[in-house]
């Protein structure tokens, strides 16, 4: 079996590894804050650099372990010197890793804070006037759609003749033409007679002022050609006599007219208390 030269191992592998680690550490130390900022700003390059460094350190560790075991078997003095030299290097590597992780974590936190603040600033609130205008416009559009007139509306009914006549009377006589008091048959005959005797003197306005009715009522009385028959005239005369007696009895209760035997039974008090039973009792 071929022998291994211990001196060649001491000169080649440990020295090469030491020089590589020292050069890596020196490059990290010589890099200033500006370079660190650049690395923190560009996370892609930092992660790339970090992965390369991790792979390199991971590949170095098993090689160091194998070399240390082999050297300890060959030369205990060389292994002791190698372990003493690698100890500070391991500590320096841990410090570098901590610094790099802190540098990587700090820009991520700052980025998250700034992104959250930008989102809050850019996100419009729901109570902004633009949103209110949009909601109002949408509501108005919905109302306009609901309130649209159908394409085929129902045809309006043509008003009848009596409706047209009633509307014309309302426009002509705002206060109404119906008299506030009833005219007796004698008054109606007197109006017709006066107008027939002297139409120029007893005009419609004069007769309306004299009988306290509207001019339209006088015009209708003069225009009508209806005349009652004899039986109708007799019935109307009796009805007006009863009306006269009832009014007289009411005024006598108020003390404005003297009480008479004819009107005493027609008073409101007797009608309410006894009605028609008083006459039946008197006869019995």
UniProtKB/Swiss-Prot annotation:
Domain of life, per lineage: Eukaryota
Entry annotated with the keyword Transit peptide: yes
UniProt biased composition (Polar residues): 268-284
Location of the region described as Disordered in the Swiss-Prot/TrEMBL record: 76-181, 259-284
Keywords tagged on the record: Mitochondrion, Transit peptide
Keyword Manganese: no
Signal peptide: none
Compositionally biased tracts (Low complexity): 76-87
Main localisation: mitochondrion
Comp. bias (Basic residues): 133-144
GO cellular component: mitochondrion; nucleus
Bias type Basic and acidic residues, positions: 157-175
Pfam families hit by this protein: Neugrin
Compartment(s): Mitochondrion
InterPro entries: NGRN/Rrg9
Role of this protein: Required for respiratory activity and maintenance and expression of the mitochondrial genome.
Family, similarity comment: Belongs to the RRG9 family.
Name of this chain's protein: Required for respiratory growth protein 9, mitochondrial
Organism of this sequence: Aspergillus niger (strain ATCC MYA-4892 / CBS 513.88 / FGSC A1513)
Lineage: Eukaryota, Fungi, Dikarya, Ascomycota, Pezizomycotina
């Amino acid at each position: 079996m071929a022998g291994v030269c211990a001196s060649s191992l001491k000169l080649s592998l440990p020295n090469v590894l030491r020089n590589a680690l020292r050069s890596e550490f020196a490059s990290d130390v010589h890099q200033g804050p500006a370079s660190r900022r650049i690395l923190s700003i560009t996370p892609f390059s930092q992660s790339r650099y970090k992965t390369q460094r991790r792979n390199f350190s991971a590949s170095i560790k098993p090689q160091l372990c194998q070399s240390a075991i082999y050297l300890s078997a060959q030369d205990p003095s060389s292994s002791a010197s190698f372990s003493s030299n690698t100890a500070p290097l391991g500590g320096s590597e841990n410090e570098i890793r901590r610094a790099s992780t802190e540098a990587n974590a700090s820009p991520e936190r700052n980025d998250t804070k700034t992104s959250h603040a930008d989102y809050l600033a850019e996100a419009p609130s729901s109570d902004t006037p633009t949103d209110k205008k949009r909601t109002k416009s949408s509501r108005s559009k919905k109302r306009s759609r609901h309130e649209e007139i159908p394409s085929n509306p129902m045809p309006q009914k043509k008003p009848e003749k009596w409706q047209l006549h009633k509307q014309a009377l309302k426009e002509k006589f705002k206060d109404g033409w119906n008299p506030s008091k009833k005219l007796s048959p004698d008054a109606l005959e007197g109006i017709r007679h006066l107008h027939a005797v002297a139409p120029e003197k007893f005009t419609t306005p004069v007769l309306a002022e004299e009988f306290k009715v509207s001019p339209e009522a006088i015009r209708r009385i003069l225009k009508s050609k209806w005349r009652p028959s004899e039986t109708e005239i007799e019935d109307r005369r009796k009805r007006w006599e009863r009306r006269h007696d009832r009014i007289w009895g009411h005024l006598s209760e108020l003390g404005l007219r003297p009480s008479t035997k004819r009107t005493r039974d027609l008073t409101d008090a007797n009608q309410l208390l006894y009605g028609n039973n008083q006459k039946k009792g008197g006869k019995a």
